[in-house]
Amino acid sequence: MKKLLLLIFIAMSAGCSREEKMLYENINEMDAEYLSTDELKAREQELKNSISEYRSILEEKIEAARDLASYHKILGKLYLDNRMFMLAAEQFDEAIKIDSENPVLFYYGALCYSRYSKSLMNQSEQYSNILIAEKYYLKTIELDSSFYKALYAVSVLYVFELDQPDRAVEYLEMLLDTQKSNYDAMFLLANAYIRLGITDQAIDIYNNIIKTSKNSVYKKQAEDNKKKLQDSGYEWN
């Protein structure tokens, strides 16, 4: 039993030593650019002692920051679920300050700004919030190019809010590269093509939906849209 406890202690100590060594090397590398070799050597033991002394405090602060980010994320989602869109956006913004490369936070932040914009009467304020939503969706995609909800959502903005259907085509094609049976994206892509005057592409999409979809609602909608388009009576919205 004593041998087992000794082995556990040695293993834990070795783990701590390795982590402290890695932390020392990382910090030392930061200073190496502007300190001379003699200066680095002179402060080596001081730095190692500081790391050993403050390691537990540093770990607590890191963990506290993670907990704070989770708090803002959870509160933001609760606000969003209760349709308190600006309060939710503020919480996701706070979480982003801590967890700055998390695509989920940017996606939900974008969703909040987009939904909030619909409540505004002032067109300038509405447009400003739509642009923030666009920026956040694009950041989501930059961080995770396969985030299909963001690809679809930013395309909705480009088609219905920003009148940039050409940009919607770009992101919808990215989405459909990996989700070939995403019929909502197909309908939106057809809409974008129509707005660009590329009606033959839209008809091809409707034919594909009619041929491949097992959903009777999708089939009928595609058939109706195709007929309206062929009869030149398609309603853009």
Q: What do the predicted segments below correspond to?
A:
Residues 74, 108-109, 153, 188, ...:
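Canonical tetratricopeptide repeat
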Residues 47-56, 82-94, 118-138, 162-174, ...:
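Structural signature of tandem alpha-helical TPR/SEL1-like repeats
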